[in-house]
C-alpha cells in the first residue's frame, strides 16, 4: 500500500506524529532523528525538545571539543578559531575567545525597525515560529558532535524554548551560505545576554539580559569555535523549510479532496480516475492521485459512472474538461516532487551543516561547504512550483463552477436567488484571479538571482532562507485559494442538490398538470409519451437558463415545453394556453417550496461521495458556514441576522474556513479520510482485473 500511496503515507505520518507530540508535550533530541513534525510542534509551542541523555551523544560532544583543543595545543591553525573569517581567513590571532565575540559583531548586522502600530515587537523581524524552528534544528545539528560546541551551550538554547523565550531576529540579510550567519547570530547573542538583542515571551519583549534574569537563566560564554559552531549552518533555512513542507503536504491532500468535490459539483465522471488509465502510464504520483480521488467519489450520487452504469449516449460533453479529467496527471508529479522535497529537508534536519567539521574518530578537522544550503533551495523551489500547480487547477475548477456557461446547469455566479441582483461568487472569482497571479509570480526560482558576497569568497550562495520565505508566501496564497475553493465547492454542491430536487419535484408536478388537463383528450399511451418527453425536457432545459431570474426561468421552462405539448395534444389552443399559465404557477410553487425546505434542512450530504461528504459536513456543521441564500445574506446595520444566525460578508465566511486550514483543524477531519484510504486493501488478481478501485467506483469497498 505504501508504494501506491507514498505521499498519503508521508502526510498521514506527519499528522499522526504532530498529534502525538502535542499529546506528550516533549520529545528527545539526539542529533539523528529530528522529524519535520518535531520542528512544527516546537515552532507552534505544542511540544518542547529535551536533550538526549545517551552517553554516546554526550561523549561525542565532548570528544569534538577535545579534538579542537588538541589542535590548538599543537599550535595548528583552525579556520574561524585562530584565523579570520571568509575572505579574511589569511589573518591569524591567539585571542580565540575574543575572536568569537568579533564574529558576533560582524554578523549581528540586521535591521529591526521601530514598530509604528504601538506593538512591542520590532518591525522587519522574523516570525517567532520560524525562529523556534531554527533553534531546535541548530541544537540537533550541534548534538551530532561535529561542531565543537559544548553541552552547556546547547542547553542554553533549549532552555529558551522550555521557558517560552524567543529571540527577536531580523527578517532579511542572510545569503544562506556560509549558512544563515546573521539570523543565528541573534539567537547566539540572546543566550550570551547581549543587551542589544531582544527576547520575546507572550508578546512581551525585553533586552536579553533582563529576560534571562526574569527566567532564572544565566548568560553563557562562548568557547573557541562555539560562536562559529552555532551560526555557521543552515538551521534557519532548514527550520523554515520543514514548516513549509509540512503545510505543503496538507494542502496537497486538501487539493485532491477539493478536486473530488468539484467533480461532483460539475457532474463530472469518475472514469478519469479509473485504475486502467493510471496503469497505462504508471507514474507513482498519477497512480496515487487517481486512486485517492476515486476513493473520495465512493458512494457519490452526483458524479457520473459511480452508482450507475456508464452512459454511452451522453448528449452533452463527451468527456470532462481538463481541470477535472487531467487531475491525476497534473497533481501526480507534484506529489512526487513533494516527497523529494520532504526527503531533502529531512536529511538536512539531521545533518552537520557547519564548517569546519570535527571528526573525533580520526582526530581531524575538515574544511568544506556543508553550510551551502542548495538542497534546501532545491526543496523550496519544488514546493512552491507545486503550490502554483495546485492553485492553477483549483482556479480552473472554481471558474467552471462559477461560470454559468461552463457549470453544466448551475446558476450564474452560484447565486441561490435571482442573478440580476445577486452575484454571490463573482467577487470570489476576482479574488481567485488575484491570488493566482501572485502565486504564479512567487513560483519563480530564487536560485537564479544569487549575488557574489563577502570579498567574492561567497561567490555562489544558496539564498535558501529567502527561497523558503517565498515558498511560505506561496503557501499563504494557496491557503487562501483553498479556502475560497472550499466555500465555492460547498455552495456548488448545495445548489446541485437543490436544483436536482427541484427538477424531480417539478417533473412530477408537470406530469400531474398534463394528466389533469389532457387525459380526457389524449389516449393513455400518447399521454405517457408526453410525460416522459416533458421529464427529459425539464432536466435539459432548466440547466440552460441559469442566467435568468428564477420566475423567468420557470416561464422559460414552460415556454420551451410548448412545442412538445403541441405535438401530442390536438386540442383547443385555449386549453394549451390555460395549461401554460397553470404550469408556470405550479413550477414556481414547486421552486419556492423546494427552496424553503432545502434552506431549512439541506440534504446535500446524502448525495456526496466519501471525500466531499466529510469536507461538506465539517464546513456546514463544525464550522457553521451555511448554504449562502443570496442577496438576503448581506449584513447591514438594520439586518444583522438570518434564521437566528449572524449574517456575515462572503469574505467573513471564507475567513472562518481559512482559519481552519491555517490552524489545521480541517486536517483533523481529513485524517479519518486518509486512514480510510490507507486501510483499503488491494485485491488484485494476477492480471489486476480485480483491482479494488474497479469496485470502489461502483460504491463497493472490499477491505
Curated annotation (Swiss-Prot):
Q: Which GO CC terms are listed, alphabetically? A: cytoplasm
- Reactions this protein catalyses: L-phenylalanine = L-beta-phenylalanine
Active site residues of this protein = 79
Alphabetized, the UniProt keywords read: Isomerase, Virulence
GO molecular-function term, one example from the UniProt record: ammonia-lyase activity
Give the protein's recorded name: Phenylalanine aminomutase (L-beta-phenylalanine forming)
| Keyword Hydrolase included in the entry's annotation | no
Q: Give the source species.
A: Talaromyces islandicus
